[in-house]
Amino acid sequence: MPQEQYTHHRSTMPGSVGPQVYKVGIYGWRKRCLYFFVLLLMILILVNLAMTIWILKVMNFTIDGMGNLRITEKGLKLEGDSEFLQPLYAKEIQSRPGNALYFKSARNVTVNILNDQTKVLTQLITGPKAVEAYGKKFEVKTVSGKLLFSADNNEVVVGAERLRVLGAEGTVFPKSIETPNVRADPFKELRLESPTRSLVMEAPKGVEINAEAGNMEATCRTELRLESKDGEIKLDAAKIRLPRLPHGSYTPTGTRQKVFEICVCANGRLFLSQAGAGSTCQINTSVCL
């Protein structure tokens, strides 16, 4: 520091000496320390400025945003791949027009829908082994809004025109099912089977079994029973064959058993008539009326 000298004039008195000079300033080790701290401060300022410029360059700070992050009037815009290390809260997430939106994770991706009390209402978890959805109801719809699939605690609804099962073992229903139509693919067989229990088909207005281009077989191990409680059973075909009917043998003696013969009316109705020495169908023609 510049050295300042101040001259102090004492009052003129007899026997007084001349004027005295007093030095005011910083000298010695104090002066060197001051210069050192000033130099250190300048170095820190330069380093701080250089680090700031480097960070701005690396993070790609611009007027519009930082790096792949752009601030627009509608919100934030991210370009390229982005990684979030903490939970992300957003009202809407959409991709660039014409591009797909991808969610990638090393473990799983979880989407939670919360209420005002931060309680989870619905949850979707996609993991490496399964996709799980939690909620009161699950629906799948087309672009036009038509229901394709719906599931809740009460029922599962399939709204597609056709439900196809491609598994080799078919479909197993442990409970009853309701459907207006069961059919196989063209040139494929339709098989309804109950390996250990009975198979029951019921309908309030009738059950129709139709094979348009092939045969229809009903096979059982013990008894095959066709019963109509209030109506009749029709066998409408040009030929009706019963090839395995048992043949009776003539026994002139012994207990007489009741034997009947099968009679056919002109309209195709069948009835039984007590057998005699000759045909007795003409006697009981009142059944054909």
Curated annotation (Swiss-Prot):
GO terms for cellular component: cytoskeleton; dystrophin-associated glycoprotein complex; endoplasmic reticulum membrane; Golgi membrane; plasma membrane; sarcoglycan complex; sarcolemma; sarcoplasmic reticulum. It is a single-pass type II membrane protein. Disulfide bonds join 263-288, 265-281. The keyword Disulfide bond applies. Glycosylated. Disulfide bonds are present. Residues 57-289 are extracellular. Its main location: membrane. GO terms for biological process: calcium ion homeostasis; calcium-mediated signaling; cardiac muscle cell contraction; cardiac muscle cell development; cardiac muscle tissue development; coronary vasculature morphogenesis; heart contraction; muscle organ development. It comes from the Eukaryota. It is found in: Cell membrane, Sarcolemma; Cytoplasm, Cytoskeleton. Glycans are attached at residues 60, 108, 284. Residues 1-35 are cytoplasmic. The chain crosses the membrane at residues 36-56. Keywords: Cardiomyopathy, Cell membrane, Cytoplasm, Cytoskeleton, Disease variant, Disulfide bond, Glycoprotein, Limb-girdle muscular dystrophy, Membrane, Signal-anchor, Transmembrane, Transmembrane helix. InterPro entries: Sarcoglycan, Sarcoglycan_gamma/delta/zeta. Most strongly expressed in skeletal and cardiac muscle. Also detected in smooth muscle. Weak expression in brain and lung. It holds the Pfam family Sarcoglycan_1. Component of the sarcoglycan complex, a subcomplex of the dystrophin-glycoprotein complex which forms a link between the F-actin cytoskeleton and the extracellular matrix. Interacts with FLNC and DAG1. Cross-link to form 2 major subcomplexes: one consisting of SGCB, SGCD and SGCG and the other consisting of SGCB and SGCD. The association between SGCB and SGCG is particularly strong while SGCA is loosely associated with the other sarcoglycans. It is linked to Muscular dystrophy, limb-girdle, autosomal recessive 6: An autosomal recessive degenerative myopathy initially affecting the proximal limb girdle musculature. Muscle from patients shows a complete loss of delta-sarcoglycan as well as of the others components of the sarcoglycan complex. Cardiomyopathy, dilated, 1L: A disorder characterized by ventricular dilation and impaired systolic function, resulting in congestive heart failure and arrhythmia. Patients are at risk of premature death. This is Delta-sarcoglycan. It comes from Homo sapiens (Human).
